[in-house]
Amino acid sequence: MVVVMESGDVKAPFRGGSNEAGRSDYGATFYKVLLNDLIPMVDRTFRTLSDRDHRAMAGLSWGGHQTFDVVFTHLDLFSYAGAFSGAIFGLDVNQTYGGIFSRPAEVNSRLHYLFLGCGSEEDMGTGRLVADLRRAGVRVDSYVSVGTHHEWLTWRRCLRAFVPHLFKR
């Protein structure tokens, strides 16, 4: 397995704001860099299996938000997704990403594994999102790191829970 850790904190003009449009501007140029530059460079440099069945993406905090933005708009490239304390606030599972979550059979057949984790002492909305996805019929695995906050120990535990489920198909 090749693990690539890139910072999604790509600097670009950022207008800010608390609404979803303003928040989505933050690091927005990262998506182009990831899809057009980073993935092709990794596939050229390392011996990879470059199909979607052998590609996963996960992120912590804002990287969890970016993971959802990338994976659920590029299911042709990814089949595993993980968000560790993902900043995925107020996601309307019926509307977002072209309404993909309102088609659970499609999500469940295309996404081999979906994981959401968080610390027990933080409120990133992970529990609500897991419940909403399950109510919609989407298969999702969840993990709560007992006694931890929005911190590295949480994310290390999430990684440990996530990785064993990758590339089992």
Could you tell me what each predicted segment is?
Residues M1-R169:
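Non-catalytic cap/lid and distal C-terminal segments of serine-dependent acyl enzymes
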